[in-house]
């Protein structure tokens, strides 16, 4: 399934290069127009990142998010600076279907695993940004990739599997925002090792060939941000090159999960 992604600063559509606020690109679209275009092109899930909220949770873009989270035909996942349970409650109450949790999921896994149990595995998405060293070790930097958490991927997932985690958005940070191709080996490895998790691949998608390369890995979703905003291909083209069985399953899950919107 293709998952269009939109990053927001001050209510405007932007992209950061490898998470760097100093390397920001603004796009001349409104978030509402982009969402509607993606819906008309066949998107059933969308991913929004509140970059203001990521910097300061008191500056969350609630007015803007309110206009997009209640879309009748889409599952909406929202992330950016979730630091406490009140943030989770706030986003779910706003209408988000899933809350995406990054740094806190790494720093305080006991707390976040409790949220998985409290709100259900369909409501929480772990956002794990992975740094791979020369020896192949997978560590998890936090707070905009500035801090080394000292935590590796396998140890962290062992804790979350016990809680029944279902959705993990996984980014190889060396690929993010580059359009230079994705880390196929990484996704093949994690999908084989953790088959009960629905993996969302993120970072580096710059062509339809990059999407097709992910098909054998077993990922359930592909995050598309800059590539769609800059017209590298259309969403219709991306959806068309993904296996029909996966698309049908996604549509089935979407219709069952959005019935109360």
From Swiss-Prot:
Active site: 7, 129
GO molecular function: 1-(5-phosphoribosyl)-5-[(5-phosphoribosylamino)methylideneamino]imidazole-4-carboxamide isomerase activity
Biological or metabolic pathway of the protein: Amino-acid biosynthesis; L-histidine biosynthesis; L-histidine from 5-phospho-alpha-D-ribose 1-diphosphate: step 4/9
Alphabetic keyword roster: Amino-acid biosynthesis, Cytoplasm, Histidine biosynthesis, Isomerase
A single GO BP: L-histidine biosynthetic process
Keyword field contains Coiled coil: no
Main localization (coarse): cytoplasm
Localisation per UniProt entry: Cytoplasm
GO cellular component, one term: cytoplasm
Gene3D superfamilies: Aldolase class I
EC number: 5.3.1.16
Pfam family, one: His_biosynth
Reactions it catalyzes: 1-(5-phospho-beta-D-ribosyl)-5-[(5-phospho-beta-D-ribosylamino)methylideneamino]imidazole-4-carboxamide = 5-[(5-phospho-1-deoxy-D-ribulos-1-ylimino)methylamino]-1-(5-phospho-beta-D-ribosyl)imidazole-4-carboxamide
Keyword Amino-acid biosynthesis: yes
Record family assignment: Belongs to the HisA/HisF family.
Name of protein: 1-(5-phosphoribosyl)-5-[(5-phosphoribosylamino)methylideneamino] imidazole-4-carboxamide isomerase
Species the sequence originates in: Colwellia psychrerythraea (strain 34H / ATCC BAA-681) (Vibrio psychroerythus)
